[in-house]
Amino acid sequence: MRTIPLLPCASIDEIAEFADHLGFRVTYRQVRPNPYIALNRDGLELHYFGIPGFLPEDSYGSCVVITDDIEALFDAFAAGLRAAYGKLPVSGFPRITRPRRRKDNDNRTGFSLVDPSGNWIRVTAERSPVESPSDAPVSRLRAAVDNAVVIADSHGDAAQAAKILAGALARDITGRPEERWEAEEYLAELRERLAD
C-alpha cells in the first residue's frame, strides 16, 4: 500500500522549476483539461494540481514525509535552494526550516519545506523500533526552545516564538551553556525570518 499527496498550486510550471532545484524529476505533466504534475525524487512522490489564482497565503496543503536519513535530505534540499536563491530561504514562499527536535512529533527530528504555493511538506525522522519519547524532565530553557519550535516551525508564527525565546533567555542566568547556545542560535534565526 502507498499514498501520494495531491497538493494545490497556482502554477505547475513554477512548481516544476522549484522541484528541479530539490532534485525531483517530472514523471507526468498535463495541461488540459486540468493542470497536473507528478514529481519523483528517489521514490518520494509529490503530485500537484493547478488552481488559477491560488494564493500561497491561503494554502492549507500539507503532507508528511518520513525518512531514515533526515540530515541527508535536508542537506540536499538546502544545497538546491542555496543554488537557486543565493541563500537558504527562511521566510516567505518558498522557505525551509532547519532540522530540530520536535516535541509535537514524539521528539523526533524534523524540518518543514514550504513550497512556492504555500504547501507545508513536513519531513520527519523514521522512528527506530526501540526509540520512544523522552519522559525525562527538561529545563525551563529547553522547554522554551521546544515550544518555540512548535510555534514557529509547525504553526508558522515566528514573532511569537521569538518572544518566547527572548523572555526565556532573559530569565535563564544559570542554564547549561549548550542550551543557551541553541536558544540564542534559534532566536537569531527567528529574527532573520522576521527581518526578511
Regions found by a protein language model. Name each.
Residues 7-46, 159-175:
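Core segments of cupin and vicinal oxygen chelate
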Residues 1, 29-41, 74, 78, ...:
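Phosphate-binding glycine-rich loops and adjacent basic patches that engage nucleotide phosphates
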Residues 2-10, 56-82, 85-196:
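Vicinal oxygen chelate
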Residues 27-62, 67, 120-125, 192-194:
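Conserved short beta-strand elements that form part of the metal-binding/catalytic scaffold
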Residues 2-14, 41-48, 85-90, 127-130:
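Short N-terminal helix-initiation segments at or just after the protein's N-terminus
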Residues 33-36, 51, 80-89:
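Intrinsically disordered, low-complexity boundary segments flanking structured domains
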